């Protein structure tokens, strides 16, 4: 028997001892988010949700720099489950994972896994698996089982099986029977499930001493069903049946599988057997089966099952009638479909738009359409006709027949020239039921024409609507104007705006801002200014995103001066300036015309009564510091503080970096004091600048002191910080100390670049410790870090190589490295 091996295992464990209490059904994918949060943490979670939901979002938001040190796993889990969109949750999770001092636990990973699984974001879910393994966080069997189920729900069977083995090998979790059941369930979620994999996992369970229960065999049954192993599936089913575990869920798996395999007769036989055992399938299963029978073109069996449902007292809903009528329509059984339609009416269930759409769209002959209309015409009123139109249009649109929807409306308006007269229109007119569609239906068709890139047809339809005495709604104009603007047709959109005004339809703020955005996209600041005059007439405000975009676009095209002039013209039209756009202009001037021009605009803005914000000050301070004009930046910094603005950590970092690069290390240190006074905590960027500056000033002991201070504040160094300290110590001749931090960097799996290796090598050579220097050199070569010829460190590598060639203690080893192809044959060693 195909299933004899599994049956034997079941019997063996049944004899060993009495079966323990059955494990609960695996946890639902809905996370228990009742973990207690302190009020301050709850407020923190809400603030993070607000920041990440706010548009536009920036990971450099000053508020995030303030909130990040307070992160913990409970807060992260709460925030993740507070987002309605998976993308925001994933953005937040990645941001949180990178914050210094924070480390995810399995609850946080499970929260993210559940969100990604429900959203079917498999690529991100795969990345999360790698992150879980790299984190080496310990987990309970239950938590691990939940993670496995999330992978299974997303169809990531290979990943679920792989992570199961890896976690077990790494000693992060000891799986129990529940964990194995979750893995089996995950495997069963995939239609391409491997029978061999399932049976291998069952053997592992046996070797671990775990019992097989209903929740073990149910996914096994599902796998056999998924893979079309009908005989094995029947064997498992019989085993479950013999143990008294048969329930509605298990029965549903097999009967639905029979339906999927096209074995409708066997499915029907199984249903009758279940009835004999007093196991009733639920209403949903009956509906699924009827749908499957219809899909298999077994309308006869579908109606037999339908009759069985009615005898059991199950009343069909409109969705089930829809499936049956759809099947009848597919087989062109018009009379039976109409008979069922009349039954719906007799039962008091109003036919919905889907059924009307199927009846009207499935039959194309004039006689058939006349027959349908004869059945429904007596019951339809104006509202029903509108419903019919809407159903027809939805059917047209669903089938990408937007042109047919357009022709139908033209027929209703008496325009028959192109495609002839619609038979439905004739029938409606014969019974005085023909009326024009309402504004909503017309708007749907116009919107679909626009989406189908048939803007010209939409314009024609709009004009015909006006000629027939209908007043188009603002939505119709907005849709067409938006479509024109997406195609860059700003002139035509302005013309339609004039027609809109002539028709007595007031444009909305959306209407004008669509055109404004189009003009901004084309860098047409003259046209944009003319449109602003129209906005002022209607009392609308231009969207700052379009103004800012236009300014940025002009600056990107090297027209920063035009951008500034445009902002002046905007103010001249009576619109209040916005610092976001002004800051964009300042930034553009700095990049195009230099820092002085940006500073000049900044002063003009202040002179005109505007109050620059923190971002505007930061842009200038950062630019001045980069230009080695930190003294001027300091004046601006003090000016900002005097106005009550709080500098961000990023602004402090710019100042500290500027002072350090100019050799004013003590002034940089004074900025640290001001940060603490301002209740701002230095971050890793702050300390990196300080450490680099202290080493450059010949104060390596103070650099190490700051390093230890940073780690003591749970601010952990990153790769750049390590490299700054190592290279700085090397320049100060502290090669031994630099090597210690180099090894620590390697332990943290941070990869040094060639500059770090060469700094160490050069430092050891300077102290005449050629053996230590050559050891580091060999490491660099073996790890493939020898710089290529275009690398700025290439000549330094050539120089140190020359020194090793000249030394008898290292030249022979160097020859071997060259022969092995690990370093290029340099001109300096070509004689070897």
UniProtKB/Swiss-Prot annotation:
Keyword field: Mitochondrion, Repeat, Transit peptide
Record: transit peptide: 1-27
Calcium recorded as keyword: no
Ranges: PPR repeats: 105-139, 140-174, 176-212, 213-247, 252-281, 282-316, 317-351, 352-383, 385-415, 438-472, 473-507, 508-542, 543-577, 578-612, 613-647, 648-682, 683-717, 718-752, 753-787
Gene3D superfamilies in alphabetical order: Tetratricopeptide repeat domain
InterPro entries according to UniProt: Pentatricopeptide_rpt, TPR-like_helical_dom_sf
GO CC annotation: mitochondrion
Localization: Mitochondrion
Chain segments annotated as coiled-coil in the UniProt record: none
Organism superkingdom: Eukaryota
Pfam family, one: PPR
Similarity comment text for this entry: Belongs to the PPR family. P subfamily.
PANTHER family, sorted: PENTATRICOPEPTIDE REPEAT-CONTAINING PROTEIN 4, MITOCHONDRIAL-RELATED, RESPIRATORY COMPLEX I CHAPERONE (CIA84), PUTATIVE (AFU_ORTHOLOGUE AFUA_2G06020)-RELATED
Name of the featured protein: Putative pentatricopeptide repeat-containing protein At5g08310, mitochondrial
Source organism (scientific name): Arabidopsis thaliana (Mouse-ear cress)
